């Protein structure tokens, strides 16, 4: 369900469970939700996806959510500081990695991030570090190898990781940085050149929100995500155990 639609929704009924999550979890969480619903007849899972910081801000502003799942620790730290999640329920549930991708039909002869400094490379996309976890991971990784500043003039900031993926898939940019799980969605449109060594591991935290009428099914969903069955579903979409 679109985030804007969630903002206009009345308080969820007892059998509705609202999950707000990072854009990179879209495909995997749809599958997780479907399985959870099949095991809990009558429960309807409503899903909202976007850049982690954007989704969090919507929760802070009053959007209904029973669970928040983000793509980095900084977003969840902000959620804890804003007192919109229960810190005792916070758990890391998945691991990912940042990869450099190019359009599948690219003829630039690129092999690694160092090649992005070549004159023939004009546009490189990644999430806006101010609000998008993959952008923050990318920034940290590129700073580590002294490539962040040289690439600033070529930057095309994306609002979330899926937008960055689309830019590359549509040949609108020469290269981009996305999560490995996102690149795997379009193997015929993009080609992975390199995995980036990030200073911090790419871990995904999840937590229960503290809203007054939180769904009674929220705890069960969180446990399902952490269970062997939930982890197996995530693994099918490329996520690894934390």
Can you name each region flagged by the protein language model?
Residues 1-8:
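Bacterial N-terminal signal peptides
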Residues 8-14:
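Bacterial Sec-dependent signal peptides at the C-terminal "C-region" and cleavage site
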Residues 14-40, 44-49, 53, 57-63, ...:
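Exported/periplasmic ABC-transporter solute-binding proteins
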């Amino acid at each position: 369900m679109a985030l804007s639609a969630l903002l206009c929704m009345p308080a969820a009924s007892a059998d509705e469970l609202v999950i707000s999550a990072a854009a990179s979890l879209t495909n995997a969480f749809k599958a997780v939700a479907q399985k959870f619903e099949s095991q809990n007849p009558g429960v309807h899972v409503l899903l909202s996806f976007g850049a982690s910081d954007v989704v969090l801000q919507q929760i802070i502003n009053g959007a209904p959510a029973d669970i928040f799942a983000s793509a980095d620790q900084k977003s969840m730290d902000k959620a804890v500081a804003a007192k919109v999640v229960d810190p005792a329920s916070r758990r890391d549930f998945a691991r990912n990695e940042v990869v450099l991708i190019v359009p599948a039909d690219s003829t630039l002869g690129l092999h690694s991030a160092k090649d992005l400094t070549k004159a023939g490379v004009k546009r490189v996309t990644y999430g806006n570090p101010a609000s998008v976890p993959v952008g923050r991971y990318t920034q940290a990784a590129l700073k580590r190898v002294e490539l962040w500043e040289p690439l600033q003039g070529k930057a095309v900031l994306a609002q979330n990781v899926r937008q960055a993926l689309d830019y590359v898939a549509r040949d609108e940019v020469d290269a981009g940085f996305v999560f490995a799980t996102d690149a795997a969605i379009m193997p015929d449109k993009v080609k992975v050149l390199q995995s980036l060594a990030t200073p911090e591991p790419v871990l995904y935290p999840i937590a229960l929100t503290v809203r007054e009428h939180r769904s009674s099914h929220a705890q069960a969903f969180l446990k399902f995500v952490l269970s062997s069955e939930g982890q197996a579903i995530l693994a099918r979409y490329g996520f690894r155990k934390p």
